[in-house]
Amino acid sequence: MEAFITFARYNRQMNAQIYDVCGQLDQGQLEADRGVFFGSIYRTLNHIMIADGYWLQRVTRQPSPLADSAGEPLAIRSVDQILYQELATLSHWRSIIDDRIVGCMEALAQESADLSRLLDHRLMDGSVVQFTLHKALCHWFNHQTHHRGQVTTILSQLHIDFGVTDLLLMELN
């Protein structure tokens, strides 16, 4: 579980870094189609948030913490849905979700979670498949890194220095 705690902390730090850098971009730069899976930086950041809400819900067996401005739970209808229209709001919820993910990994370690426990995963076609907790956690952190890598590539193409992304150097920064 120590590895998953490390990944959760790394993701929290990288997400904070990416939102800080993206906060310097104008709306046009955030929303321009860049040819990645979800088109733009903004849509990619929303997609990562949706996936994290889903996985947090599955692993903790608790409702997703994502909510609207009135505090009502957000209904997630698709993996490319725009959850929040403003980057500041998305960033606020990103911080909350990242803290919850770190807390979730720490709780799993504390309770010596059974990594062979099966989780149900509903596919977009409605069918249900099962994965072990271990495989689900590996997928979850790989998914974040994969899509965040798309965003850092776009930033690099815009000649914006994102900074160090090496996990080994995380604690030095």
Task: Show where each model-derived region lies.
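Absolute protein N-terminus
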Residues: 1-2
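Short, contiguous alpha-helical
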Residues: 5-20, 29-77, 122-173
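Helix-adjacent hinge/juxtasegments
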Residues: 65-111
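Acidic catalytic patch
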Residues: 107-124
